[in-house]
From Swiss-Prot:
GO biological process: animal organ morphogenesis; chitin-based cuticle sclerotization; cuticle pigmentation; sequestering of BMP from receptor via BMP binding
Domain CTCK: 39-129
Lineage: Eukaryota, Metazoa, Ecdysozoa, Arthropoda, Hexapoda
Localization per Swiss-Prot or TrEMBL: Secreted
Name of the protein in its database record: Bursicon
C-alpha cells in the first residue's frame, strides 16, 4: 500500500512516499521531509539467452529498493518548483563470462558460445534522469486559480492512494 505523507513547509506541498509508516522524519529550519532510502544489492536469478543456445539460469545481482524524492515550491522563486528525483542505481559493476550450450550450431561453429554479462557491484540512491522543462505544465494551464491569496494557488490532490 502506498501512502501520501503531507508536510507543511513555509507553503503547502505533498510528497508521495512509498515507504509509508517506515519513513524516517528529518528536518532543518526551512523544511520537513521524509526519507525512505532502501537501495540494496539483491541476489537474483538471471536467465542468459542467445539465439540457437539453451537458456541458462545463473545467480546474479540487481539493485532493488526505493529512494526519497520530492517536489516543492522554490524558496527564492515561488513561481518555480524544485525537484529532487533519486533512483536506486548501480555504483560499479562486475563482469562475468558464461558458456552457453548451443546444440543447433551449424557445421564449423562451436557448440559452446561464450557470453559476457554484468551485474552491479554496489547500489546507491543517485539522481534519476532530469525532467525536461518542456514536459512541465505551467500552473496557469494546470487550472490553479489565482484569487490573490496563497491558499488559492493550491488544490486538493486528484490522486488516490493505491490499496
Amino acid at each position: 500500500m502506498k501512502s501520501s505523507v503531507c508536510v507543511l513547509l513555509k507553503v503547502l506541498a505533498c510528497i508521495l512516499l512509498p515507504g509509508g509508516l517506515n519513513a524516517q522524519k528529518e528536518s532543518n529550519d526551512d523544511i520537513q521531509h521524509y526519507t525512505a532510502d532502501d537501495c540494496q544489492v539483491t541476489p537474483v536469478i538471471h536467465v542468459l539467452q542467445y539465439p540457437g543456445c539453451v537458456p541458462k539460469p545463473i545467480p546474479s545481482f540487481a539493485c532493488i529498493g526505493r529512494c526519497a524524492s520530492y517536489i516543492q515550491v522554490s524558496g527564492s522563486k515561488i513561481w518555480q518548483m524544485e525537484r529532487s528525483c533519486m533512483c536506486c542505481q548501480e555504483s560499479g559493476e562486475r563482469e562475468a563470462s558464461v558458456s552457453l550450450f548451443c546444440p543447433k550450431a551449424k557445421n564449423g561453429e562451436k557448440k559452446f558460445k561464450k557470453v559476457s554479462t554484468k551485474a552491479p557491484l554496489e547500489c546507491m540512491c543517485r539522481p534519476c534522469t532530469g525532467i525536461e522543462d518542456a514536459n512541465v505544465i505551467p500552473q496557469e494551464l494546470a487550472a490553479f486559480a489565482d484569487d490573490g491569496s496563497l491558499a488559492g494557488y493550491f488544490q486538493k490532490s486528484q490522486f488516490k492512494a493505491a490499496e
